[in-house]
Amino acid sequence: MNAQSNYEFDGQVLGQTNIGFGKEGTKFLGTRYIPEFTFDKEIDSLSSFAIETSFNLSLSKTNILGHSSDANSNLSPYRIWLRYLKKNWELRLGLQKIDFGSAQLLRPIQWFNQIDPRDPLGLTNGVYGLLIRHYFKNNSNLWLWGLYGNEKQRGLDALTTLNDSPEFGGRFQTFIPKGEAALSYHYREAEANNIPFFENYSSPEHRIGFDSKIDIGFGMWTELTYVHRTKNIGILTNQLLLNFGVDYTFRIGNGLTVSKEYLFSDSTDSMTNESLRRGFSALSFNYPLGLSSSLSGLIYQQWNNNTQTLMLNYQQQFNSLSGYIILYYNPKTVEGIQQNDIFQSFSGPGIQLLIVFNH
């Protein structure tokens, strides 16, 4: 049998405008292009080799009332990885997306990406590392990873990663009656250069994660992360993040899918037992208006300060072209959900228009 090779060149072009109706009167205009090249070679019937390379090219301009306009341009790698598949094994090396867990909106185990639940495209920066996965005959799977060179905050991280320090961990996922469950572990050296008075702090950090999801006529899941730092840093020494969620599709019209999640956060000082507890909730819905259009929404509540984030999104699909009209309201401070430097959203009320072309 002759080995087969495949080449593909794809890409995504995004045009975006965002108008804030708050006191600052912020206006944003931007474009983004993510070209993607993939090469896939079949070695034999049980093994293959693949390469993916993509870049993130962005141009933007921001105007705030009473301030001069700010223009930015950026070119950075988005994904650059090599993958080797051999029977039940997968090895992937390079800049890649690593994502797992059962929660949809408020995600304690969002350890390695920056996906914002308000972003309809789910864009995120990747991490540099080696990922190894083994798939067992009973459909259970084992993940092992090692990371290096990823100093930025990710997910709900309170601290950053120490420069030039390796990270490693693993995950085992298996099936349970009516669903699946997984146990995860990750180790890194954390530093606090983003926190005043703790700029010289660094400490080994251990985190354990558990997640499960079952289908009992409706979806139900839980997700948990416990983080322990061996050196005391006040209430950030120990952190517990616990999520409960459900979803159900109602037989209304074309089918209304509703999801509800709760996130509980508890940070504790090992020496004084001082703690900080916070609560968050999120409600989302999605309703298909037809074969090519849908309406979705998100209500996000921060219980400690009684503030809300609201979003209503209309999507229209035209073959390779998609359009989004997003109405939103964000408080000045948003906690409990991931925010990144790719998806632009401002405080106060506003409207966002997205046009996406995939080739």
Short names for language-model regions:
Residues 4, 42-46, 86-89, 98, ...:
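Outer-membrane beta-barrel channels and translocator barrels
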Residues 27-33, 73-78, 85, 124-128, ...:
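Residues that define the transmembrane beta-barrel architecture of outer-membrane proteins
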Residues 316-318, 328, 345-359:
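Outer-membrane beta-barrel "beta-signal"
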Residues 176, 213-302:
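Detector for outer-membrane/organellar transmembrane beta-barrel domains
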Residues 40-142, 147, 174, 332:
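Outer membrane beta-barrel
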Residues 153-245:
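Surface-exposed beta-loop-beta
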Residues 36-38, 80-83, 131-133, 171-173, ...:
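Outer-membrane beta-barrel architecture
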Residues 12-23, 52, 56-57, 113-117, ...:
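Transmembrane beta-strand segments that form the barrel wall of outer-membrane beta-barrel proteins
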